[in-house]
Each structure stands twice: as C-alpha cells, then as structure tokens.
C-alpha cells in the first residue's frame, strides 16, 4: 500500500533516475532548466585540461557549487555540465558548458556478479569517451589549463598542450594546490616568462596565469571573471556575423531597387491606368447595390397606399401615387399639364348636357386595366431600375398639387403605372368603383330617387333663399377661407352656402391631394350622385361649374345680369356633385329639390331670382366681382390651387349650408314657388324631357 503511494508521489524515482544516467552525465539543475526554458542567446563551451591528479574534477564540482572532496577518484570519461553564469552588463541568457576532459579514459565493465578472472583483451577492446576519441577543442570558446605547483611534470604537460590550442581561443593557466605553497616547485615568474615567449601568430587570443586552491575555493572569482573574455569574443563573432548579414541585406536591397526602377511598377502612366480600372470596378457594384435597397424599400411603401385607398374614395388613391412619379424624372411636365386637364372636363360636360352621362362615366374605368398591364411589364422587364423609387419621398409628402391630380386623371394610360400597381395590391378598390359606375349608368335612376331625395333637393334648391337671408353671415365666415380661389367660385361661395351633400364627401377625401381631384379632376362621383338624387339638369349644372371655361363664360354673363342665379345654382350643384361616395340611399321628397333646380335651369322662374340674386350680389359681392375680373387674368394654376383649398374648406361650408337650407325652407319666395310648382308638375311626369330642355338652355347660354 505504502509502496504504491510512494510510486505515485515519485519519491523512489530519484534513485532510479541516477541509475539510468550513464557515466559522465548528470541531470540538469531545476533552476537552470527554468532559466534556459525562456530561451538561450549564447552557448559557451569551456574545456578543463591538465595532467592526472591536478584538480580538474575538483574544479568541475566547485563551478557547480558543490563541496570539495579530498579523496582522489580518477575520472574514467569526459564529463560535461552546465553552470550558472551571466555577463554583468547584459540580460542575455548564456548557457556555459564545462567539460572535464580525460586524456586517456579507462572503461571498466561493471558486472552483476563477482569478477572471476582478468581479461586484459576485453578491457582494451572497449572504447572510452576521452580526448583521443573526439576533438575537445571543436566549438570551444575558452580553455583552462591546470597544473600542480608542487609537481614539475604537470607543468611540462602544459608546455606540451598549449601549442595544440587554437589561436583564437583564450587560455587561462591555473596553478592549483596553492594551499601547499611551502612545497611549491614552480614559481609564478617562471610561468609568466614561458607564456610570454610562446611563439604565437599575431592576432592570437590571450593567455593569462593565476593560482588557485580548490580546497578553500581560492581563485574561483578570478576564473569567473575570466569567462567574460570568451563570452565577449563569442558576442563579437555573433555581431560580426550579423553585420555581415546586414551588409548582405543592404546589397540585396540595392539590387532590388535597381531592378524595380526598370519594371512597370515605377511607370506612372501604367499606374494611372490601373487606378482607373480599380475605380471602375468599385463603382459598378456600388451602383447595383444602391438600386437594390430602393427596390426593397418600394415594397413597404405600396401596402400603406392601399390602406389609404380604403379610407378614401375608390378614385383617390391613384392620383396620390402618380404625381411623385412624374415630378422627379420630368420637371417640365407641370408646365405642359394645364392644357391637358381642360380637354377631358369639356368633353364630359358636353356629354352630360346631351344626356350621355352613363357613357362618359363608364368610359374611364375600362382604360385603367391596360395601364396595369403596362406597369406590370415595366416592373418585370426593368428589375434593377425601378422608377417607383420616388414613392419613398412622395409618400411622406403632405399634399399633392391639384394640377398634377387633374393632369394625372386626364392621362390614364400614361401615368397610371403607380395607380395600377396600387389597385393590383388592393383589387377591392377597382371593384367598388365599377359598382358605382354601374349604378350611374341607368338613365331611369332619377325616377326612384324622386321620393327619397326631396330632403336633399329642398336644401339644395333653396340656395337662392339662402343668398338673401343667410348669405351675409355666411359670406363673412367663408370669405377668408376662399380668398385665393378663382373669381367665380369665390362669388358663389360668398353668396351661397355649400351643399349638405358635400359633408360625407369631405369626410373621406380629407387628404388634400385626393380631394382636389374629386372636385375637378374626376367627374365620375359627381355624375353618380346627381343621377341618384334627381334629374340630369342638376348634373348639367354641376359639370358646367366644374369646367373652368364655363365659369369664365358665366362670369361674363353675370355682368350682363341675366344669369347670376344660374351661376350660383351651378356653383351650388358643383359643390353638391363633388362627393366621391357611392349614391346615397333613396330618400323621400326628391322631386321638390330637383324641380327647383330644373326651374332655375330651364328659365321658368329665372328672371325674378336672377334679379334678386344680382341685387344681392351687388350689395354683398361688389368687391368680389372686381376681384373676379382681376383674378380671371391669372392662369389655370390659380384655379387649381383654389379648387384644392375648396376641398379643404368644404366641411365648414357644408355646416353653414345646412343652416342656410333650413332658412330657405322657412321662407320660400312666392314667385319662385309658382314657377317651381309648374316645374314639379312638368318634371314629375318624366325625367328624359328634362335633359333635352336643359341642353337647349345650355346652348342658348
């Protein structure tokens, strides 16, 4: 049990280790192992030579720090060990090997049993590690020659061996047994004279003489200091080799420089070409990578636009996305836009006057699918360059100019790329708009609303009464809002309150850009609501007011004094026709409102209300009339801006209009009532006759 523990601890391994080490070798001290483990900069070899019994082994032990042993035990083989030594002014780790050299070794065979007989041949046959076997001066840095000052033959050995030492190796002649100086035979002066008269070539290394005593460690310090000479020589040789290597490196570098001077690397023109090629190589991936994030950012922008379509009317989402697409690539487009939006409204007004409202309403939806295909083709073919990159900035913009909206509404196939994309994302919008168009198409639509719409019709038809009674207070409220609007709209807004039907319309198209398009750019919602509410005469008036050209004509007529009432009614119908929502559910009392409108349109009660309205306008709207003349000179851009602001303020006008309608109901006019009664009797019979008369009236105008 205890033996096993000892084996684990390793206490019994030390003696075994000594047994395994061959003769003449020993294990290195642990301290030296740790020191040399860090790295050795210099390896220095010191050789101790001398005749027998001169104290070589004693010196070898003393250098290791061991005690002096008085008994003489002849050394059989060369012994080598490492000692602690370092140069005083350097931190370099120096490994000093000390060799105890035996000139003639004797190898004794150690047997396990008793020696039975002498065998001299066997002893001679075995080889020993001695000076005869190997060259002890090879790679030697210093030599220590020892002799006994009490024995002359030991000094003769020194005289024989000194010539064999290489000339570059320093030698220290050490006279041992100084403790027995009373028996000395060799004097120090004799030794110095011999060393001085040795025949050595010039440049040979140094010879030094000293005396020592291994018994009391005398002369060891001197010997330690003597080791500085072989170390410094070794360091010098090392540095010289480094200097040679350094010089060789310098020469090689000079050759490389001379060769490189002739290569293409030193040609400036070639260098510039390489730089240009690198710049082009770096620029091409940057452009592709710059486009990829834009296309990636496009995906999140489209869904929010579809969400906004749900909140607004079906036609509103399309123009919101279109203007930004046109603005960045083609800035001159806005200048060319004004003539384009004017043409579609004229065609729609004429068509509606002649009773072709369903056709006009149905016409716009079909061309929209074709742009969708074009947009999809564009996106598929050009994947890297997406023109929709501008949507990122446009989606965050607050408003869209009314001019752009009109222009975009007029150019369905050209600029409807983004619109088609948004509808492709939200197909419910297109379906809902188709339903509205289908409801607008049937011409017999005014017949069912005759019963339900009277509430709306009464409020809308009594605009003339509102001009007299409630026109003044409303004008004070609405005038500041409509200041930048065109002349015709400003006079109408001051004289007349906005219709109540505009309230639902303004609620949805609250975004300013879409609302502007709802009023002027898109005629579909206007026609749909007018058809649902009553006869086509109201539609005709609404579209007449929508057309900016017609407004200018009505202004000229208003100067004559014949058609101020008609213009006011057209303004009021225009406001009524604005809503984008699908047709409201039928309500009773529709014929009363439409009869009043028809009477105004067809001239049954036209003269008296016209005079009263003109007188009221003279009282209330004199300054606006002058402003109208001045503002007529301004371009259509101002009208578009006014239309845009009109959409913003519709809520306030709707509220004021509700009050005006109540007052109109309370105090109707006698002369108008008679004419309106006749119109009710006439229009109650059939709606188709209304549009014909309305068309004739429009031609007379």
From Swiss-Prot:
Residues 555-569, 608-626, 654-665 have a biased composition (Basic and acidic residues). GO terms for molecular function: GTP binding. Residues 279-701 are annotated as: Disordered. InterPro entries: P-loop_NTPase, RABL6. Residues 39-279 are annotated as: Small GTPase-like. The keyword GTP-binding applies. Residues 316-344, 580-589 have a biased composition (Pro residues). Residues 683-701 have a biased composition (Gly residues). Its main location: nucleus. Belongs to the small GTPase superfamily. Rab family. This is Rab-like protein 6.
């Amino acid at each position: 049990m205890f033996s096993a523990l000892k084996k684990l601890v390793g206490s019994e391994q030390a003696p075994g280790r000594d047994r395994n080490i061959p003769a003449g070798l020993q294990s290195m001290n642990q301290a030296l192992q740790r020191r040399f483990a860090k790295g050795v900069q210099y390896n220095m070899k010191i050789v101790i030579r001398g005749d027998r019994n001169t104290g070589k082994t004693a010196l070898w032990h003393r250098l290791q720090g061991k005690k002096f042993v008085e008994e003489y035990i002849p050394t059989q083989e060369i012994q080598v060990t490492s000692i602690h030594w370092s140069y005083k002014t350097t931190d370099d780790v120096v490994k000093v090997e000390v060799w105890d050299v035996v000139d003639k070794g004797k190898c004794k065979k150690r047997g396990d049993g008793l020696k039975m007989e002498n065998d001299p041949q066997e002893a001679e046959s075995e080889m020993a590690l001695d000076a005869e076997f190997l060259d002890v001066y090879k790679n030697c840095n210093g030599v220590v020659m020892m002799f006994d000052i009490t024995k002359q033959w030991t000094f003769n050995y020194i005289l024989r061996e000194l010539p064999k030492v290489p000339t570059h190796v320093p030698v220290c002649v050490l006279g041992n047994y100084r403790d027995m100086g009373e028996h000395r035979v060799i004097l120090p002066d004799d030794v110095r004279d011999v060393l001085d008269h040795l025949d050595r070539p010039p440049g040979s290394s140094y010879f030094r003489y000293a005396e020592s005593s291994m018994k009391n460690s005398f002369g060891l310090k001197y010997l330690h200091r003597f080791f500085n000479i072989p170390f410094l020589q070794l360091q010098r040789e090392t540095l010289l080799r480094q200097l040679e290597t350094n010089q060789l490196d310098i020469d090689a570098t000079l050759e490389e420089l001379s060769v490189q001077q002739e290569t293409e690397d030193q040609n400036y023109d070639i260098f510039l070409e390489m730089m240009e090629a690198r710049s082009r190589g770096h620029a091409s991936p940057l452009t592709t990578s710059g486009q990829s994030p834009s296309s990636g950012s496009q995906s999140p922008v489209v869904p929010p636009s579809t969400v906004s379509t749900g909140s607004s009317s079906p036609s509103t989402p399309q123009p919101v996305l279109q203007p930004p697409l046109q603005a960045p690539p083609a800035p001159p487009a806005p200048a060319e836009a004004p003539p384009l939006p004017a043409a579609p409204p004229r065609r729609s007004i004429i068509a509606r006057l002649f009773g072709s409202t369903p056709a006009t309403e149905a016409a716009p939806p079909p061309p929209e699918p074709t742009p969708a295909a074009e947009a999809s083709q564009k996106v598929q073919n050009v994947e890297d360059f997406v023109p929709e990159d501008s949507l990122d900035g446009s989606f965050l913009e607050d408003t869209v100019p009314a001019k752009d909206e009109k222009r975009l509404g007029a150019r369905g196939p050209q600029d409807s790329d983004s619109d088609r994309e948004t509808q492709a994302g939200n197909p419910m919008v297109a379906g809902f708009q188709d339903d509205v168009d289908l409801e607008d198409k049937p011409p017999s639509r005014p017949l069912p609303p005759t019963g339900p719409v009277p509430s709306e019709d009464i409020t809308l038809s009594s605009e003339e009464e509102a001009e007299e009674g409630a026109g003044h207070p409303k004008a004070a409220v609405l005038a500041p809002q409509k200041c930048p609007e065109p002349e015709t709209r400003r006079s109408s807004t001051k004289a007349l309150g906005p219709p109540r039907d505009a309230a639902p319309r303004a609620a949805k198209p609250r975004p300013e850009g879409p609302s502007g398009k709802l009023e002027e750019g898109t005629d579909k919602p206007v026609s749909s609501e007018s058809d649902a509410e009553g006869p086509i005469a109201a539609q005709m008036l609404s579209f007449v007011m929508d057309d900016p050209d017609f407004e200018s004509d009505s202004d000229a007529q208003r100067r004559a004094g014949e058609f101020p009432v008609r213009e006011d009614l057209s303004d009021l119908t225009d406001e009524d026709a604005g809503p984008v929502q699908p047709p409201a559910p039928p309500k009773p009392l529709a014929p009363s409102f439409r009869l009043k409108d028809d009477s105004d349109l067809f001239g049954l009660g036209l003269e008296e209300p016209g005079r009263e309205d003109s007188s009221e306008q003279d009282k209330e709207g004199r300054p606006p009339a002058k402003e109208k003349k001045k503002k007529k000179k301004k371009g259509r851009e101002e009208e578009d801006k006014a239309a845009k602001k009109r959409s913003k303020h519709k809520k306030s006008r709707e509220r004021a209009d509700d009050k005006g309608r109540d007052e109109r109901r309370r105090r109707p006019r006698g002369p108008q009532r008679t004419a309106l009664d006749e119109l009710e009797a006439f229009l109650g019979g059939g709606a188709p006759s209304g549009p014909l008369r309305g068309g004739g009236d429009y031609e007379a105008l």
